Amino acid sequence: MVLPILPLIDDLASWGTKKAYASLVGQVLLDGSSLNKDEVLQFAKEEEVPLVALSLPNAKFSDDDIIAFLNNGVSSLFIASQDAKIVDHLVEELNVPKNRIVVEGNGVFHNQFLVNQKFSQDRIVSIKKLTKDLLIKEVVAEVRTDRPDGLFTTLVVDQYERCLGLVYSSKESIAKAIDLGRGVYYSRSRNEIWVKGETSGNGQKLLQISTDCDSDALKFIVEQENVGFCHLETMSCFGEFKHGLVGLESLLKQRLQDAPKESYTRRLFNDPALLDAKIKEEAEELTEAKGKQEISWEAADLFYFALAKLVTNNVSLKDVENNLNMKHLKITRRKGDAKPKFVAQAKAEEEAPTGPIHLHVVNASDKEGIKKALSRPIQKTSEIMHLVNPIIENVRDRGDSALLEYTEKFDGVKLSTPVLNAPFPEEYFEGLTEEMKDALDLSIENVRKFHAAQLPKETLEVETQPGVLCSRFPRPIEKVGLYIPGGTAILPSTALMLGVPAQVAQCKEIVFASPPRKSDGKVSPEVVYVAEKVGARMIVLAGGAQAVAAMAYGTETIPKVDKVLGPGNQFVTAAKMYVQNDTQALCSIDMPAGPSEVLVIADEDADADFVASDLLSQAEHGIDSQVILVGIKLSEKKIQEIQDAVHDQAMQLPRVDIVRKCIAHSTIILCDGYEEALEMSNKYAPEHLILQIANANDYVKLVDNAGSVFVGAYTPESCGDYSSGTNHTLPTYGYARQYSGANTATFQKFITAQNITPEGLENIGRAVMCVAKKEGLDGHRNAVKIRMSKLGLIPKDFQ
């Protein structure tokens, strides 16, 4: 509720001299008989007063003027009794809502739009007569209390209506708060008036005072200064606020002041063109987003860059909120159609594009062009973590109930249990054809052969000195969780690429996780078939970060695993990164992941159709896939053949729209030699490297960084993805510099052992004691010294 006093402004100069305390009321009445149209609009637009009313004299303002007032910040119209006849005109002709019209009756203005439902004439006070003392008197007279100490309960909120704390006020503290324009309260512990921030420095600028509906509690709206309201140095006495738009605005304001010169945020602040481009990019991604999680994610991205533009231009969220409030009050509204250029663009997108699907061409000597071609999309890790962390923590703390809630929320399926235990019911194999079984069996067997060959044949033993035998032997990781992307996609290949090596390594417990289908709550029969073949204990019917958390921490029905493996979207990757760094989880992962990618090296003799097919097999994964062709001494004719083949084949693919967008940011890099091409590939470190060059096998020795290499014209990436035997779970985003693809050793750990005889101790003991002494670790030294002394290998008085 606002206070039952309404300052009447008949000239703007008087407002300017008394604004500091008059604005605390939170409402004003503009005198339409004294102010002209421009003055009314100027005040309504520029002054930050929550409620602006206008006394409307008959016939002074035109209909257009009245609509302009109501559409630009004037909340309601006060009509004197003698002018009441214009009310019908306002409602019926101008479409003004009745609750925005206040009509006088017997000296009282009855109103349903402002919070107070009526104002008597004596409560409407000319701004020229309004003093601090009068305002204090009105406030104190309005509020009441039944407390024995006479104090008034006071809720303190910030300008965004977020609660900072609950305090108490006395008549004297209210008077002082209005006098100083600061947050002033009554301290019950000290039994005295409390000027907030007087000792702590965490003061408050008082913006508005109001009462509740019964006038037995006050609300102070303040602008909090420095670290916060609470003595514990949090913004609120109820803890820190959640990260939201207000928190992001605060963070960006801070970064505007102290962001490092080379940071990405500083680049955004200093480069308006880059910032505008990111806003357009994120807006486009939001229009293309599907599903609740993706739409909310893309919207958050757009909000980030939009807020960066606001902060850069000294525009606050409060300014935006005021604008929204003003728009909410509009009487006449435009139809809401998009601007013509965007309508035209939308129509153009609805029509099938007819332009050629071609890659960009850049020469290796063009350093900037190469840098752009080899750059990968920026991954907003910290922003993703803000979304993922609460999901992980909720599943960790609440187990199955949280997991089921997220499955219903994100996958649209309400399940009674989050797991499908082995042996798997026959109904889950329905729809699985014999042809598919044969294809999966062949793939499983080939992957098994290749990964079984990787098992060490015997324990590694090395005698480093006579009597010193060192050994290393593998042991399987006991429990592994294998994430299989699913939902609308069917990816049995990922299931077998992870499940078979786990079985070969003899992991004791294999757990699959895959999001259920929205249609029936099941996973695809192909995935269930692979799970049965590799001896999986169960399939967790969940996806995303929640599935990773369930396996990493365990729930009532899901065992805690020791390692989580498998590809996924950015949320899955973020969850894997989180759990591997949490000592409470004690869970490792296979590798980080990014968008899928391929780099093809081709020379003049390469088959253009083969090259195009390899590029397109990667491009159809998604618009963010990375597709690069490095050409060695390619002629203009060969380049055109490849471009034509890309276009012709792409137009035959069901996912041509995705391919078109991917190829639009893909590149052909022209090199002069094989070594230069391999050097460029090593720098990029692709997930998939395809060598369509003469004598391809001779150049494999030059490959330093790649997830997997496909050698020769008849080795498409597709074979490695499904059936050749190598693993398709590979490092992306340049991580091939540090990580291997999934292999048998991925599912093992290696333990070392040493067996030292007295002869061996004699050979290395003095060296051990020497180094231990230098490091100041006498216990280490003594463990050797005691043994050697008892063996008579050193004198008893040896120091």
Swiss-Prot record:
Substrates-to-products reaction catalysed: 1-(5-phospho-beta-D-ribosyl)-5'-AMP + H2O = 1-(5-phospho-beta-D-ribosyl)-5-[(5-phospho-beta-D-ribosylamino)methylideneamino]imidazole-4-carboxamide; 1-(5-phospho-beta-D-ribosyl)-ATP + H2O = 1-(5-phospho-beta-D-ribosyl)-5'-AMP + diphosphate + H(+); L-histidinol + 2 NAD(+) + H2O = L-histidine + 2 NADH + 3 H(+)
Keywords attached to this entry: Amino-acid biosynthesis, ATP-binding, Histidine biosynthesis, Hydrolase, Metal-binding, Multifunctional enzyme, NAD, Nucleotide-binding, Oxidoreductase, Zinc
InterPro entries: Ald_DH/histidinol_DH, HisE, Histidine_synth_trifunct, Histidinol_DH_CS, Hstdl_DH, PRib-ATP_PPHydrolase-like, PRib_AMP_CycHydrolase_dom, PRib_AMP_CycHydrolase_sf
Ranges where the record places region Phosphoribosyl-AMP cyclohydrolase: 1-229
Location of region: Histidinol dehydrogenase: 313-799
An annotated GO BP: L-histidine biosynthetic process
Positions annotated to bind Zn(2+): 618, 621, 721, 780
Co-factor binding details: Binds 1 zinc ion.
Renumbered residue ranges of the record's region Phosphoribosyl-ATP pyrophosphohydrolase: 230-312
Gene Ontology molecular functions: ATP binding; histidinol dehydrogenase activity; metal ion binding; NAD binding; phosphoribosyl-AMP cyclohydrolase activity; phosphoribosyl-ATP diphosphatase activity
Keyword Amino-acid biosynthesis: yes
PROSITE patterns (alphabetical): HISOL_DEHYDROGENASE (PS00611)
Record-listed E.C. numbers: 3.5.4.19, 3.6.1.31, 1.1.1.23
Active-site residues from the entry: 687-688
Lineage top rank: taxon: Eukaryota
Pathway(s) it belongs to: Amino-acid biosynthesis; L-histidine biosynthesis; L-histidine from 5-phospho-alpha-D-ribose 1-diphosphate: step 2/9; Amino-acid biosynthesis; L-histidine biosynthesis; L-histidine from 5-phospho-alpha-D-ribose 1-diphosphate: step 3/9; Amino-acid biosynthesis; L-histidine biosynthesis; L-histidine from 5-phospho-alpha-D-ribose 1-diphosphate: step 9/9
Short name of any one Pfam family annotated for the protein: PRA-PH
GO CC annotation: cytosol
Family statement: In the C-terminal section; belongs to the histidinol dehydrogenase family.
Protein name according to UniProt: Histidine biosynthesis trifunctional protein
Species assigned in the record: Saccharomyces bayanus (Yeast)
Taxonomic classification: Eukaryota, Fungi, Dikarya, Ascomycota, Saccharomycotina
